[in-house]
């Protein structure tokens, strides 16, 4: 990464400018938040291939909620997050209770989410706009000029570190990732943790 930055700075004097770096960090923030959830799933020894359409479904349902008026605008973010959590719970149930390989069940959930969104939109681009809160998080910035999206990424990252290193849930995630059966025999509620992890990733 350092080498890329150095080479880029040779071609453009503004490549390493604070404004450009903050812009790139704002773009990276969205992927960073998504990657945080995916990382916890990987620590379980599983994989989540439903990310593309779970993210798309959450965003599309959030913007759809905005079209419901003031109440819908206030509930837009909870609706989007709830949609992701619901799809994550489906994936988690398939892995934890039905014992379907995570690669298979999450790929299926991804396809189902895609189909549901096509039915919801009729195959056309959604026409509803984002809510003020969504625009504030996505494009706003603090008084210091730091993008709000970057602040959210930092908060999510700190919360993930705390969850994984300072809680029983985090220790159980690592234990399941090392050997699920051993974690189960030691008394850990492995199924609940697996479902919760996929819900968090959603």
Residue ranges and their predicted role:
Residues 102-166, 193-196:
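Transmembrane helix-bundle core of multi-pass membrane transporters
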Residues 21, 25, 29, 112, ...:
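Hydrophobic alpha-helical elements at and bordering transmembrane segments
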Residues 4, 30-38, 54, 58, ...:
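Alpha-helical transmembrane segments in multi-pass membrane proteins
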Residues 71-80, 86-91, 95, 143-202:
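Helix-loop-helix "hairpin" substructures at the membrane interface of multi-pass membrane proteins
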Residues 2-16, 44, 118-125, 162-168:
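Structural signal for alpha-helical transmembrane segments and their membrane-water exit/capping regions
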Residues 5-73, 93-100:
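Single transmembrane alpha-helix segments in multi-pass membrane proteins
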Residues 46, 99-103, 129, 178-180, ...:
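Juxtamembrane helix-boundary/capping and inter-helix hinge elements in multi-pass membrane proteins
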């Amino acid at each position: 990464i350092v080498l890329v930055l150095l080479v880029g700075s040779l071609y453009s004097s503004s490549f390493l400018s604070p404004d450009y770096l903050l812009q790139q960090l704002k773009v990276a923030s969205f992927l960073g938040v998504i990657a945080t959830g995916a990382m916890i799933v990987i620590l379980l020894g599983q994989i989540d291939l439903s990310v593309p359409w779970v993210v798309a479904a959450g965003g599309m349902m959030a913007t759809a909620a905005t079209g419901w008026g003031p109440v819908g605008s206030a509930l837009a973010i909870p609706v989007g997050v709830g949609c992701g959590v619901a799809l994550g719970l489906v994936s988690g149930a398939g892995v934890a209770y039905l014992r379907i390989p995570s690669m298979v069940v999450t790929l299926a959930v991804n396809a189902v989410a895609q189909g549901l969104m096509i039915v919801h939109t009729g195959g056309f681009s959604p026409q509803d706009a984002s809510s003020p809160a969504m625009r504030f998080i996505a494009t706003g910035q603090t008084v210091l000029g730091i993008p709000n999206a970057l602040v959210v990424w930092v908060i999510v990252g700190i919360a993930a570190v705390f969850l994984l290193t300072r809680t029983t849930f985090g220790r159980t995630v690592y234990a399941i990732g090392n050997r699920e059966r051993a974690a189960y025999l030691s008394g850990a509620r492995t199924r609940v943790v697996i479902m919760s992890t996929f819900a968090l990733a959603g």
